[in-house]
Protein backbone atom coordinates (compact mmCIF):
# COMPACT_ATOMS: atom_id res chain seq x y z
CA UNK A 1 0.00 0.00 0.00
CA UNK A 2 2.81 2.37 0.94
CA UNK A 3 4.74 1.53 -2.25
CA UNK A 4 1.79 2.63 -4.39
CA UNK A 5 1.83 6.09 -2.81
CA UNK A 6 5.45 6.81 -3.85
CA UNK A 7 5.69 8.99 -6.99
CA UNK A 8 7.36 7.28 -9.96
CA UNK A 9 10.10 9.86 -10.23
CA UNK A 10 11.20 9.09 -6.64
CA UNK A 11 11.45 5.32 -7.10
CA UNK A 12 14.90 3.87 -7.81
CA UNK A 13 15.21 2.30 -11.27
CA UNK A 14 15.17 -1.50 -11.48
CA UNK A 15 18.52 -3.23 -11.79
CA UNK A 16 17.77 -4.16 -15.39
CA UNK A 17 17.32 -0.50 -16.27
CA UNK A 18 20.44 0.71 -14.50
CA UNK A 19 22.76 2.48 -16.89
CA UNK A 20 26.21 1.03 -17.27
CA UNK A 21 28.83 3.61 -16.22
CA UNK A 22 30.96 4.76 -19.13
CA UNK A 23 34.14 6.70 -19.76
CA UNK A 24 32.56 10.07 -18.92
CA UNK A 25 31.32 8.83 -15.55
CA UNK A 26 34.79 7.71 -14.48
CA UNK A 27 36.33 10.88 -15.92
CA UNK A 28 33.94 12.97 -13.83
CA UNK A 29 34.90 11.13 -10.65
CA UNK A 30 38.60 11.48 -11.47
CA UNK A 31 38.12 15.18 -12.10
CA UNK A 32 36.54 15.71 -8.69
CA UNK A 33 39.34 13.83 -6.90
CA UNK A 34 41.88 15.90 -8.83
CA UNK A 35 40.52 19.02 -7.13
CA UNK A 36 41.92 17.68 -3.85
CA UNK A 37 45.24 16.45 -5.16
CA UNK A 38 45.80 19.43 -7.46
CA UNK A 39 45.27 21.91 -4.64
CA UNK A 40 47.78 20.15 -2.37
CA UNK A 41 50.23 19.13 -5.10
CA UNK A 42 52.72 21.97 -4.64
CA UNK A 43 51.65 22.76 -1.08
CA UNK A 44 53.02 19.61 0.54
CA UNK A 45 56.68 20.00 -0.57
CA UNK A 46 56.76 23.61 0.66
CA UNK A 47 54.93 22.86 3.92
CA UNK A 48 57.14 19.83 4.58
CA UNK A 49 60.32 21.79 3.85
CA UNK A 50 59.14 24.56 6.18
CA UNK A 51 58.28 22.09 8.98
CA UNK A 52 61.36 19.85 8.67
CA UNK A 53 63.99 22.37 7.57
CA UNK A 54 65.95 20.38 4.96
CA UNK A 55 65.52 18.53 1.69
CA UNK A 56 67.13 15.41 3.22
CA UNK A 57 64.55 15.29 6.03
CA UNK A 58 61.74 15.72 3.51
CA UNK A 59 63.13 12.80 1.48
CA UNK A 60 63.31 10.56 4.56
CA UNK A 61 59.68 11.27 5.52
CA UNK A 62 58.47 10.65 1.97
CA UNK A 63 60.45 7.38 1.94
CA UNK A 64 58.77 6.13 5.14
CA UNK A 65 55.32 7.13 3.92
CA UNK A 66 55.97 5.35 0.63
CA UNK A 67 56.72 2.10 2.47
CA UNK A 68 53.50 2.36 4.46
CA UNK A 69 51.45 3.16 1.37
CA UNK A 70 52.92 0.18 -0.51
CA UNK A 71 51.97 -2.25 2.26
CA UNK A 72 48.44 -0.86 2.49
CA UNK A 73 48.01 -0.98 -1.28
CA UNK A 74 49.03 -4.63 -1.51
CA UNK A 75 46.62 -5.56 1.27
CA UNK A 76 43.62 -3.76 -0.22
CA UNK A 77 42.44 -6.70 -2.41
CA UNK A 78 42.22 -8.83 0.74
CA UNK A 79 40.45 -6.00 2.60
CA UNK A 80 38.08 -5.70 -0.36
CA UNK A 81 36.91 -9.26 0.32
CA UNK A 82 35.75 -8.13 3.75
CA UNK A 83 34.70 -4.55 3.00
CA UNK A 84 32.59 -3.77 -0.11
CA UNK A 85 34.34 -1.69 -2.72
CA UNK A 86 31.93 1.24 -2.44
CA UNK A 87 32.77 1.56 1.26
CA UNK A 88 36.50 1.25 0.58
CA UNK A 89 36.29 4.14 -1.87
CA UNK A 90 34.33 6.16 0.67
CA UNK A 91 36.96 5.46 3.33
CA UNK A 92 39.64 6.64 0.89
CA UNK A 93 37.82 9.92 0.37
CA UNK A 94 37.48 10.34 4.13
CA UNK A 95 41.26 9.92 4.43
CA UNK A 96 41.52 13.06 2.30
CA UNK A 97 39.14 14.92 4.62
CA UNK A 98 41.03 13.86 7.74
CA UNK A 99 44.33 14.75 6.08
CA UNK A 100 43.07 18.21 5.24
CA UNK A 101 42.04 18.83 8.84
CA UNK A 102 45.45 17.70 10.12
CA UNK A 103 47.26 19.87 7.59
CA UNK A 104 45.26 22.90 8.70
CA UNK A 105 46.76 22.51 12.19
CA UNK A 106 50.23 23.26 10.81
CA UNK A 107 53.64 22.29 12.17
CA UNK A 108 54.54 18.61 12.21
CA UNK A 109 50.86 17.72 11.74
CA UNK A 110 51.63 18.30 8.06
CA UNK A 111 53.43 14.94 8.15
CA UNK A 112 50.27 13.24 9.47
CA UNK A 113 48.30 15.06 6.79
CA UNK A 114 50.58 13.69 4.08
CA UNK A 115 50.21 10.15 5.46
CA UNK A 116 46.41 10.34 5.40
CA UNK A 117 46.23 11.93 1.96
CA UNK A 118 48.63 9.31 0.57
CA UNK A 119 46.45 6.51 1.94
CA UNK A 120 43.44 8.25 0.41
CA UNK A 121 45.16 8.36 -2.96
CA UNK A 122 46.15 4.70 -3.01
CA UNK A 123 42.71 3.53 -1.81
CA UNK A 124 40.72 5.61 -4.29
CA UNK A 125 43.12 4.79 -7.13
CA UNK A 126 42.84 1.03 -6.65
CA UNK A 127 39.06 1.10 -6.31
CA UNK A 128 38.55 3.37 -9.31
CA UNK A 129 40.87 1.33 -11.54
CA UNK A 130 39.00 -1.83 -10.55
CA UNK A 131 35.73 -0.14 -11.56
CA UNK A 132 37.26 0.91 -14.88
CA UNK A 133 38.47 -2.62 -15.64
CA UNK A 134 35.00 -3.94 -14.75
CA UNK A 135 33.01 -1.66 -17.01
CA UNK A 136 35.29 -0.41 -19.80
CA UNK A 137 36.25 -2.56 -22.80
CA UNK A 138 39.93 -2.87 -23.70
CA UNK A 139 39.34 -0.98 -26.95
CA UNK A 140 38.00 1.97 -24.92
CA UNK A 141 40.76 2.10 -22.30
CA UNK A 142 42.80 4.68 -24.20
CA UNK A 143 39.79 6.98 -24.61
CA UNK A 144 38.84 6.51 -20.95
CA UNK A 145 42.31 7.36 -19.66
CA UNK A 146 42.45 10.42 -21.91
CA UNK A 147 39.02 11.63 -20.79
CA UNK A 148 40.04 11.18 -17.15
CA UNK A 149 43.06 13.39 -17.72
CA UNK A 150 41.08 15.93 -19.76
CA UNK A 151 38.37 16.25 -17.10
CA UNK A 152 41.01 16.78 -14.42
CA UNK A 153 43.07 19.25 -16.48
CA UNK A 154 41.57 22.37 -14.89
CA UNK A 155 42.22 21.03 -11.38
CA UNK A 156 45.83 20.13 -12.13
CA UNK A 157 46.38 23.44 -13.94
CA UNK A 158 44.81 25.86 -11.44
CA UNK A 159 45.29 23.78 -8.28
CA UNK A 160 49.09 24.01 -7.75
CA UNK A 161 49.37 27.77 -8.22
CA UNK A 162 46.14 28.40 -6.28
CA UNK A 163 47.30 26.12 -3.46
CA UNK A 164 50.61 27.96 -3.07
CA UNK A 165 48.84 31.34 -3.23
CA UNK A 166 46.43 30.25 -0.48
CA UNK A 167 49.34 28.88 1.57
CA UNK A 168 51.03 32.29 1.43
CA UNK A 169 47.77 34.07 2.24
CA UNK A 170 46.71 31.83 5.15
CA UNK A 171 48.50 28.46 5.70
CA UNK A 172 45.39 26.42 6.69
CA UNK A 173 43.42 27.60 3.62
CA UNK A 174 44.51 25.00 0.99
CA UNK A 175 44.00 22.15 3.46
CA UNK A 176 40.50 23.29 4.42
CA UNK A 177 39.63 23.65 0.74
CA UNK A 178 40.77 20.04 0.24
CA UNK A 179 38.33 18.97 2.99
CA UNK A 180 35.46 20.61 1.09
CA UNK A 181 36.51 18.91 -2.15
CA UNK A 182 36.68 15.50 -0.41
CA UNK A 183 33.05 15.88 0.69
CA UNK A 184 32.12 16.72 -2.91
CA UNK A 185 33.98 13.59 -4.04
CA UNK A 186 31.98 11.34 -1.70
CA UNK A 187 28.72 12.97 -2.78
CA UNK A 188 29.45 12.49 -6.49
CA UNK A 189 30.54 8.88 -5.96
CA UNK A 190 27.34 7.90 -4.16
CA UNK A 191 25.22 9.83 -6.64
CA UNK A 192 26.79 7.76 -9.45
CA UNK A 193 25.77 4.48 -7.72
CA UNK A 194 28.74 2.46 -8.91
CA UNK A 195 28.07 -0.18 -6.27
CA UNK A 196 30.68 -2.88 -5.71
CA UNK A 197 31.60 -3.58 -9.32
CA UNK A 198 30.89 -6.63 -11.46
CA UNK A 199 30.79 -10.13 -10.06
CA UNK A 200 33.01 -12.29 -12.25
CA UNK A 201 32.17 -15.65 -10.70
CA UNK A 202 31.26 -17.13 -7.36
CA UNK A 203 34.22 -18.07 -5.21
CA UNK A 204 34.70 -21.79 -4.75
CA UNK A 205 37.29 -21.69 -2.01
CA UNK A 206 38.95 -19.61 0.62
CA UNK A 207 40.15 -16.15 -0.32
CA UNK A 208 43.78 -16.37 -1.46
CA UNK A 209 46.57 -14.45 0.16
CA UNK A 210 46.77 -11.09 -1.66
CA UNK A 211 50.53 -11.43 -1.99
CA UNK A 212 50.00 -14.66 -3.95
CA UNK A 213 49.00 -12.58 -6.96
CA UNK A 214 52.52 -11.24 -7.13
CA UNK A 215 53.49 -14.63 -8.56
CA UNK A 216 50.96 -14.23 -11.37
CA UNK A 217 52.28 -10.73 -11.97
CA UNK A 218 55.93 -11.80 -12.21
CA UNK A 219 54.96 -14.62 -14.60
CA UNK A 220 53.74 -12.10 -17.21
CA UNK A 221 56.55 -10.02 -18.78
CA UNK A 222 54.09 -7.57 -20.37
CA UNK A 223 52.70 -6.70 -16.96
CA UNK A 224 56.19 -6.24 -15.53
CA UNK A 225 57.19 -3.90 -18.37
CA UNK A 226 53.95 -1.92 -18.08
CA UNK A 227 54.43 -1.57 -14.33
CA UNK A 228 58.04 -0.40 -14.75
CA UNK A 229 56.88 2.25 -17.21
CA UNK A 230 54.42 3.51 -14.60
CA UNK A 231 57.04 3.47 -11.82
CA UNK A 232 59.63 5.51 -13.73
CA UNK A 233 57.01 7.88 -15.11
CA UNK A 234 55.93 8.51 -11.53
CA UNK A 235 59.58 9.00 -10.50
CA UNK A 236 59.74 11.70 -13.16
CA UNK A 237 56.76 13.45 -11.62
CA UNK A 238 58.34 13.08 -8.17
CA UNK A 239 61.55 14.72 -9.35
CA UNK A 240 59.59 17.56 -10.91
CA UNK A 241 56.85 18.22 -8.34
CA UNK A 242 58.74 17.60 -5.08
CA UNK A 243 62.33 18.59 -5.83
CA UNK A 244 61.81 21.44 -8.31
CA UNK A 245 60.19 23.76 -5.69
CA UNK A 246 62.94 22.93 -3.16
CA UNK A 247 65.64 23.46 -5.81
CA UNK A 248 64.07 26.83 -6.71
CA UNK A 249 64.09 27.98 -3.07
CA UNK A 250 67.69 26.85 -2.47
CA UNK A 251 68.78 28.58 -5.70
CA UNK A 252 67.26 31.90 -4.69
CA UNK A 253 64.29 31.77 -7.07
CA UNK A 254 60.81 32.89 -5.91
CA UNK A 255 58.88 30.44 -3.70
CA UNK A 256 55.97 30.29 -6.14
CA UNK A 257 58.21 29.17 -9.04
CA UNK A 258 57.46 25.48 -8.54
CA UNK A 259 53.70 25.94 -8.24
CA UNK A 260 53.51 28.13 -11.34
CA UNK A 261 55.58 25.78 -13.50
CA UNK A 262 53.68 22.69 -12.36
CA UNK A 263 50.42 24.46 -13.21
CA UNK A 264 51.69 25.42 -16.66
CA UNK A 265 52.85 21.85 -17.29
CA UNK A 266 49.47 20.48 -16.27
CA UNK A 267 47.74 22.86 -18.66
CA UNK A 268 48.96 20.54 -21.42
CA UNK A 269 46.39 18.05 -20.14
CA UNK A 270 43.89 19.98 -22.25
CA UNK A 271 45.54 18.64 -25.40
CA UNK A 272 45.58 15.00 -24.27
CA UNK A 273 42.84 14.11 -26.81
CA UNK A 274 45.23 15.24 -29.55
CA UNK A 275 48.03 13.23 -27.96
CA UNK A 276 45.78 10.14 -27.92
CA UNK A 277 45.04 10.57 -31.63
CA UNK A 278 48.76 10.73 -32.30
CA UNK A 279 49.32 7.57 -30.24
CA UNK A 280 46.51 5.74 -32.05
CA UNK A 281 48.01 6.75 -35.36
CA UNK A 282 51.60 5.83 -34.53
CA UNK A 283 51.26 3.18 -31.72
CA UNK A 284 51.61 3.04 -27.96
CA UNK A 285 55.24 2.03 -28.40
CA UNK A 286 56.04 5.24 -30.28
CA UNK A 287 54.29 7.37 -27.66
CA UNK A 288 56.03 5.67 -24.74
CA UNK A 289 59.48 5.86 -26.34
CA UNK A 290 59.14 9.51 -27.34
CA UNK A 291 57.87 10.44 -23.88
CA UNK A 292 60.69 8.71 -22.02
CA UNK A 293 63.40 9.99 -24.38
CA UNK A 294 62.43 13.67 -24.20
CA UNK A 295 61.75 13.62 -20.46
CA UNK A 296 65.11 11.94 -19.81
CA UNK A 297 66.90 14.60 -21.85
CA UNK A 298 65.18 17.36 -19.88
CA UNK A 299 66.27 15.92 -16.52
CA UNK A 300 69.83 15.23 -17.65
CA UNK A 301 70.23 18.75 -19.04
CA UNK A 302 68.90 20.16 -15.75
CA UNK A 303 71.45 18.07 -13.85
CA UNK A 304 74.32 19.43 -15.95
CA UNK A 305 73.26 23.08 -16.10
CA UNK A 306 75.28 25.47 -13.88
CA UNK A 307 72.59 28.17 -14.22
CA UNK A 308 69.44 27.60 -12.09
CA UNK A 309 67.12 29.33 -14.56
CA UNK A 310 68.35 27.10 -17.41
CA UNK A 311 68.01 24.01 -15.22
CA UNK A 312 64.42 24.93 -14.39
CA UNK A 313 63.71 25.56 -18.08
CA UNK A 314 65.10 22.13 -18.99
CA UNK A 315 62.96 20.45 -16.34
CA UNK A 316 59.88 22.26 -17.58
CA UNK A 317 60.57 21.23 -21.19
CA UNK A 318 60.96 17.60 -20.20
CA UNK A 319 57.86 17.67 -18.00
CA UNK A 320 55.63 18.36 -21.01
CA UNK A 321 56.44 14.86 -22.25
CA UNK A 322 55.42 13.40 -18.88
CA UNK A 323 51.89 14.30 -20.00
CA UNK A 324 52.41 12.17 -23.11
CA UNK A 325 53.52 9.33 -20.82
CA UNK A 326 50.37 9.81 -18.75
CA UNK A 327 48.38 9.24 -21.95
CA UNK A 328 50.29 6.22 -23.23
CA UNK A 329 52.45 4.85 -20.39
CA UNK A 330 49.70 3.01 -18.52
CA UNK A 331 48.15 1.33 -21.56
CA UNK A 332 50.66 -1.58 -21.91
CA UNK A 333 49.71 -2.80 -18.42
CA UNK A 334 45.95 -2.19 -18.63
CA UNK A 335 45.68 -3.92 -22.02
CA UNK A 336 47.44 -7.02 -20.69
CA UNK A 337 45.29 -7.59 -17.57
CA UNK A 338 43.05 -10.68 -17.54
CA UNK A 339 39.37 -10.14 -16.54
CA UNK A 340 39.62 -12.67 -13.70
CA UNK A 341 42.47 -10.71 -12.10
CA UNK A 342 41.07 -7.19 -12.31
CA UNK A 343 40.95 -6.21 -8.64
CA UNK A 344 44.23 -7.90 -7.70
CA UNK A 345 46.18 -6.55 -10.69
CA UNK A 346 44.68 -3.11 -10.14
CA UNK A 347 46.26 -3.25 -6.68
CA UNK A 348 49.59 -4.42 -8.11
CA UNK A 349 49.50 -1.69 -10.76
CA UNK A 350 48.64 1.01 -8.22
CA UNK A 351 51.77 0.09 -6.27
CA UNK A 352 53.78 2.05 -8.86
CA UNK A 353 52.91 5.19 -6.90
CA UNK A 354 54.22 3.73 -3.68
CA UNK A 355 57.32 2.18 -5.22
CA UNK A 356 58.20 5.47 -6.90
CA UNK A 357 57.45 7.15 -3.58
CA UNK A 358 60.04 4.85 -2.00
CA UNK A 359 62.64 4.88 -4.77
CA UNK A 360 62.77 8.61 -5.47
CA UNK A 361 63.05 9.98 -1.91
CA UNK A 362 65.07 6.94 -0.78
CA UNK A 363 67.71 7.29 -3.49
CA UNK A 364 67.35 11.06 -3.20
CA UNK A 365 68.24 11.00 0.49
CA UNK A 366 71.40 9.02 -0.30
CA UNK A 367 72.35 11.33 -3.16
CA UNK A 368 71.90 14.41 -0.97
CA UNK A 369 74.56 13.06 1.37
CA UNK A 370 77.20 13.56 -1.34
CA UNK A 371 75.66 15.83 -3.99
CA UNK A 372 73.17 18.69 -4.44
CA UNK A 373 69.58 18.27 -5.63
CA UNK A 374 70.78 18.23 -9.24
CA UNK A 375 72.15 14.76 -8.50
CA UNK A 376 68.54 13.62 -8.06
CA UNK A 377 67.69 15.06 -11.48
CA UNK A 378 70.55 13.04 -12.98
CA UNK A 379 69.38 9.79 -11.35
CA UNK A 380 65.80 10.32 -12.55
CA UNK A 381 67.04 11.10 -16.06
CA UNK A 382 69.07 7.88 -16.23
CA UNK A 383 66.09 5.83 -15.07
CA UNK A 384 63.84 7.40 -17.71
CA UNK A 385 66.48 6.67 -20.34
CA UNK A 386 66.49 3.00 -19.35
CA UNK A 387 62.71 2.89 -19.89
CA UNK A 388 63.19 4.33 -23.37
CA UNK A 389 65.33 1.30 -24.18
CA UNK A 390 62.87 -1.16 -22.59
CA UNK A 391 59.95 0.34 -24.52
CA UNK A 392 61.64 -0.73 -27.73
CA UNK A 393 60.46 -4.28 -26.96
CA UNK A 394 56.77 -3.36 -27.12
CA UNK A 395 54.73 -4.58 -30.09
CA UNK A 396 54.93 -1.94 -32.85
CA UNK A 397 51.15 -2.10 -33.47
CA UNK A 398 50.06 -1.93 -29.82
CA UNK A 399 47.24 0.59 -29.38
CA UNK A 400 47.00 1.52 -33.06
CA UNK A 401 43.41 2.33 -34.10
CA UNK A 402 41.79 -0.51 -36.14
CA UNK A 403 41.31 1.72 -39.19
CA UNK A 404 44.95 2.80 -39.15
CA UNK A 405 46.06 -0.81 -38.63
CA UNK A 406 44.08 -1.92 -41.67
CA UNK A 407 45.52 0.90 -43.75
CA UNK A 408 49.07 -0.10 -42.82
CA UNK A 409 48.44 -3.74 -43.70
CA UNK A 410 46.95 -2.74 -47.02
CA UNK A 411 50.00 -0.62 -47.75
Each language-model region and where it sits:
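Juxtamembrane intracellular "pre-TM" segments in multi-pass secondary transporters
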Residues: 2-23, 196-228, 410-411
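Helix-to-loop junctions at the C-terminal end of transmembrane segments
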Residues: 72-84, 271-284, 368
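Structural signature of the two symmetry-related core transmembrane helices
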Residues: 87-101, 286-301
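A late C-terminal transmembrane helix in Major Facilitator Superfamily
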Residues: 340-369
Amino acid sequence: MFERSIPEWLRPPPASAAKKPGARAFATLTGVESMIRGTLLSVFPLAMYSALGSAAAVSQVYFAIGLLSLMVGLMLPWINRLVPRRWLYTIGAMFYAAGGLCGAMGGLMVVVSLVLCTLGTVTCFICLNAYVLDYIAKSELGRTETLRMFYSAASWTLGPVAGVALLNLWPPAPFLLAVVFSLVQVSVFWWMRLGNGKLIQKARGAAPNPLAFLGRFFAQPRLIAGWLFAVLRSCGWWGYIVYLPIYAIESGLPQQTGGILVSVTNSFLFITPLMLRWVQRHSVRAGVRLGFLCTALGFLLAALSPVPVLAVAALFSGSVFLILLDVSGGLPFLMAVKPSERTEMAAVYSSFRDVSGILTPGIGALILLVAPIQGIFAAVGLGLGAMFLLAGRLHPMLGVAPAERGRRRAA
